[in-house]
Amino acid sequence: MTTTTRLAAGLILLALAACRREAAGPIHFAREEIDITVRPGAVEVLGTYHFTCSAEETVAAIISYPFPLDSVHGYPDSVVLPGRRFELADSAARFVMRFPPRGEASFTAWYRQPLSGSEARYIVTSTRQWRRPIDRAQFRVTVPADLPGATLNYRPDSTRRTDSTLTWFFTRLRFYPSEDVIVRWSDRAR
């Protein structure tokens, strides 16, 4: 990527970040489909993210795809963004994404993150940086059926239990979250 392209992408990102809620900018984070699989010691996330562009010309912007990092959530040991060149920096994968004029663009991401406690968190509060809600957010959260005391902080629309797994499903429209998706469980031995 040339210096000019980086500068232009950076300026566009700054312009998007500086927009007020009334004028959220030409890029809209429209939908996401998220599959979270939790087990003691690790969490895996597979997500597909869809955007619309209202601009008359192609827009390039730097996308920052964040991971929780704290005493429980280690740095991801695997990150995959198919078809994308990305850099890992701080607590995120960053890449340039091009949005076609008056069109849609999507990306898929997968990561595996080590856990050293009895909690797994998926960041959704970063949605607020887009300055308007996501039209539709769909989640599937799966844990081992024998994970003691497993709870989800969002109310599921439905639940499916098998001999080996418990899966929560929930969809939110006009999703503008004030808290991340969090799964907690008892740290006593299974």
Where do the protein language model's features map onto the residues?
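Bacterial N-terminal signal peptides that target proteins for export
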Residues: 1-8
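Hydrophobic h-region of N-terminal signal peptides that target proteins for export
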Residues: 11-20
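Lumenal/extracellular ectodomains and adaptor appendage modules
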Residues: 19-190
